[in-house]
């Protein structure tokens, strides 16, 4: 089961020999037929198993997946700061109306005949009675502060991640380093 998962995760292309090998392993070793094993110089005995197991280990040890949670290798501090600022401002702009409604709902006393049934109902009633811009009131100050804050956070995070990864696991990525530097800037 775990071997199948490793083979499936580590191979990206549909025509990759690892997928063919994985299908052969899942089918019970005999799907290739004795003629294939004999043509490779074996009779299906320990030699065939050793070559297959070494091929499986080779495929499993390849790390050909790109790092999807990072900017390209040539990125500098300015790029990280810009990415952080844009991400922070966008996050606050999208979530601010929901946060406004959440705050409004939390300030009300719990009552079976409540004024709002859910978040969408509350948002629509606020917009209808108080105007379209009411849930966005104060967003400009929040977005202005979010840009620099998230820019510094992202830049510090990436710098610490690289520094700690080089110390803990030189030349690679370390989950311990990522978790440690996640808690530092906060």
Swiss-Prot record:
Domain of life: Eukaryota
TM segment ranges: 77-96, 137-157, 172-185
GO MF assignments: ferrous iron transmembrane transporter activity
GO cellular component: mitochondrial inner membrane
Keyword annotations: Ion transport, Iron, Iron transport, Membrane, Mitochondrion, Mitochondrion inner membrane, Transmembrane, Transmembrane helix, Transport
Solcar repeat spans: 75-163
Record keyword Transmembrane helix present: yes
GO biological-process terms attached to the record: iron import into the mitochondrion
Reaction(s) the record says it catalyses: Fe(2+)(in) = Fe(2+)(out)
Entry's localization field: Mitochondrion inner membrane
Gene3D superfamilies in alphabetical order: Mitochondrial carrier domain
Topology in the lipid bilayer: Multi-pass membrane protein
Keyword Ion transport: yes
Family note: Belongs to the mitochondrial carrier (TC 2.A.29) family.
Function statement: Mitochondrial iron transporter that mediates iron uptake. Probably required for heme synthesis of hemoproteins and Fe-S cluster assembly in non-erythroid cells.
Protein name: Mitoferrin-2A
Name of encoding gene: slc25a28-a
